[in-house]
Amino acid sequence: MEQTLFKIYDKFWGVTEKKDAANHARQHLPEGIKEENDFAYLPDGHRYHLLDVYYPENHEGKLPVVIDVHGGGWMYGDKELNKIYCEYIAARGFLVFNMSYRLAPEVTVPEQLQDVCAALKWINENMDRFPADRNAIMLTGDSAGGQLSAYTAALSVSEPLRRHFDVEDFGLHFNCVTLTSPVAYMNVPGYMGAYGRMMWGEPPFQRCVKPYLNFDEIIDLAPGYPPALLITSSGDFMALKQTRALHELFMRKGVSTKLLDYPKYEGKNLPHVFAVLDPESSAGKPCMDTVAAFFREHIQA
């Protein structure tokens, strides 16, 4: 049954890949951005254990750092998926690390977290090769990448969680996190829960008794969680309720949090991760500016 479901989901993500490729073909990269590509953050030769670095060609001194984790339902995509988005972040005066990680069904979500943490360890050990300010770091992610980023931020401040997920302390402090449409509740009723449990390597059609598939199960183990900006929109059919729920959880637990909940724009619903899909659109550009301002506020805090 699970193999059949994976085949169905794989077809869905294949259609999504074609749509994303067409969307990217309509866009242009910003000018004046230096790219350094395909650094191997693990020495195993895996094509998904690579990351890129982008930053303005003309800059003065060290730049604040953004580390991005792409979305794609834990099954689809690599660093190329968010390249345009990341370069437009870099164009706002930041140095951006953009990583790939292994995908389901080859691996499960906990193993993807191990990949993300391995990339962060490499970044920590190699940051001084780049014009990067290690005292100013924001972690970002969208959709599935938002979930991975949300959990990674918890791992950064929690030794018990690092032991549970079998990851090392990667040695980075996040000034803040930006989570766009994070799918942070994966053991829930309905199709979303069935899909989420499969991504964790669990049976899809029975509620999982293992801990930590839902973010509210780990927040109490992560004191000192960094300030969080959450982004969703009226047409965010995958994660509107989840993003709002995570914002409410942060408020209850005393985490500094801000929610950007976009209504209709020019009479139309803004889709899931709209600013990531088209960062220079009339709706995406001001959203990106808000993200940059949020980061700069927490550099100065």
Please tell me what each predicted stretch does.
Residues 1-301:
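Alpha/beta-hydrolase superfamily serine-hydrolase fold, recognizing
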